[in-house]
């Protein structure tokens, strides 16, 4: 799979997008705040899990490059790894 294709992450985000549309409808219908808060929490978790999956994949790619590319390319891969780690 090319480095920027993440079908599982896209699927998760599309599901979260659909969930958000449902929450908007719930708000417009005047549904109870507790239900809205629960659903918003679920969307937050879904987005967080998508982010983690994306970052974990990227970390794996960086580690592969760092291990197979000595010298400047390996060091560059480690710098990229450190840069993305702050989003975990």
List each model region and its residues:
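Solvent-exposed interaction patches of small proteins and small membrane subunits
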Residues: 1-88
């Amino acid at each position: 799979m090319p480095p920027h294709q993440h079908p599982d992450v896209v699927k998760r985000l599309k599901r979260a997008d659909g969930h958000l549309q449902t929450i908007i409808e719930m708000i417009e219908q005047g549904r109870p705040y507790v239900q809205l808060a629960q659903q918003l929490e679920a969307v937050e978790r879904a987005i967080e899990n998508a982010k983690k999956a994306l970052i974990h994949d990227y970390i794996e790619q960086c580690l592969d490059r760092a291990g197979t590319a000595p010298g400047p390319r390996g060091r560059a891969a480690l710098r990229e790894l450190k840069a993305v780690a702050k989003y975990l």
